[in-house]
From Swiss-Prot:
GO terms for cellular component: tRNA methyltransferase complex. Belongs to the class I-like SAM-binding methyltransferase superfamily. TrmB family. Its EC number is 2.1.1.33. The keyword Disulfide bond does not apply. It is an enzyme of class 2 (transferase). The active site is at D137. The keyword Transferase applies. Keywords: Methyltransferase, S-adenosyl-L-methionine, Transferase, tRNA processing. This is tRNA (guanine-N(7)-)-methyltransferase. S-adenosyl-L-methionine binds at E63, E88, D115, D137. Catalyzes the formation of N(7)-methylguanine at position 46 (m7G46) in tRNA.
Length: 232
């Protein structure tokens, strides 16, 4: 079994915490909804993770670095019987998502606005059915590669919290980071790449809504890859 608290990097996996000044509507949404949806890690995680949502749920999924929230919003509406935990340390991304909720706190959504490794270390074993990591910061300079989120320590974290046959999904338009992730996951004993042909990773996931970042990448001639790994 992977250890509960693997090594944590001394440098954050994310860059700035804040970008442009928030609009008044976004500020109001953050002040109203984030306290209601934010997870409190000061107490141990419950063994039955759906108790965080106050109702029985079919499964719990995790999205790390949800950006503007396009995919996460689409998923919580498509699957009301599934619990979703969204992690986004960038203030502007969190503000976009909560503003899009239009004052409603979906019962199947919980949020966390800090380092995802803290949340991963807090979660109980085998509690998550799927982890999504889409378009993470590629940290293109070689001296910054140690800050890429996909690494041995974080794959150990994923392996601990994912149930057997759970999925880790990764999408990126940066070929170097795609290859990096393939090599890391194929070298890890707890993950298996499920692609049987190139068509399996060239096309978006079922129900994929697209994102603004993805659209920009494609306009600039970069072609995303959509990888899926299974916890064995």
């Amino acid at each position: 079994m992977a250890e509960r608290h693997p090594e944590r990097s001394t440098e954050a996996f994310f860059g700035r915490r804040r970008g442009k000044r928030l609009r008044s509507q976004q500020t109001a949404a953050v002040e109203k909804l984030l306290p209601r949806l934010k997870l409190d890690l000061s107490s141990p995680a419950p063994a039955a993770l759906d108790s965080l949502f106050g109702k029985p749920l079919r499964e719990i999924r995790l999205e790390i670095g949800f950006g503007g929230g396009e995919h996460l919003l689409n998923e919580i509406r498509r699957h009301p019987d599934v619990g979703f935990i969204g992690v986004e340390p960038f203030v502007n991304g969190m503000a976009k998502l909560v503003a899009a909720l239009e004052g409603e706190a979906p019962p199947n959504l919980r949020l966390y606005d800090d380092d995802a490794t803290k949340l991963l270390d807090w979660l109980p074993d085998s509690a998550i059915s799927r982890i999504d990591l889409f378009y993470p910061d590629p940290w293109p300079k070689k001296r910054h590669w140690k800050r890429r989120f996909v690494n041995k320590a974080n794959l150990d974290r994923f392996a601990r919290v994912l149930c057997v046959d759970g999925q880790f999904r990764f999408a990126s338009d940066i070929e170097g980071y795609v290859n990096w992730t393939l090599l890391a996951c194929r070298a890890h004993p707890d993950f298996r790449w499920v692609a049987k042909s190139a068509e399996d990773w060239r096309h978006p996931y079922e129900g994929w809504p697209g994102t603004r970042y993805e659209a920009k990448a494609m306009r600039e001639g970069r072609h995303p890859a959509y990888l899926t790994f299974v916890r064995v």
